[in-house]
């Protein structure tokens, strides 16, 4: 049940973070930064919950769990410090890296959730 809730939180927070980030990036929602950061933290927290939770299932993967932890740390770190990284003409590179990490966060979380559901399907 916890993985199912975390998966729903990941979907909702991840999608809203993606939309608010693109709005912020395009200059539309400059006041959405705090909301975007909160949604990103929720998405990463859900990723970590799913990653660690699926690792303890019968056919869980500790590689997925470790990848979830590393990806979450990278996503948060790049998000928090991106305004001071590659300042100038190449700043778009950091923005694309952060966007890519966010999309990977959603994808890896759902991959872990599906793995968990498949491993526990017979025990219901």
Question: What residue ranges belong to the model's regions?
Answer:
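Polytopic transmembrane helical bundles with strong interfacial aromatic enrichment
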Residues: 1-124
């Amino acid at each position: 049940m916890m993985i199912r809730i975390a998966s729903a939180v990941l979907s909702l927070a991840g999608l809203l973070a993606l939309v608010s980030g693109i709005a912020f990036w395009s200059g539309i929602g400059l006041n959405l930064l705090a909301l975007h950061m909160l949604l990103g933290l929720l998405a990463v927290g859900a990723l970590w919950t799913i990653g660690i939770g699926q690792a303890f299932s019968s056919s869980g993967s500790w590689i997925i769990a470790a990848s979830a932890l590393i990806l979450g740390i990278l996503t948060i770190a790049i998000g928090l410090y991106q305004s001071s990284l590659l300042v100038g003409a190449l700043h778009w590179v950091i923005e694309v890296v952060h966007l890519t990490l966010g999309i990977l966060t959603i994808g890896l979380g759902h991959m872990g959730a599906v793995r968990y559901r498949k491993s526990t399907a017979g025990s219901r």
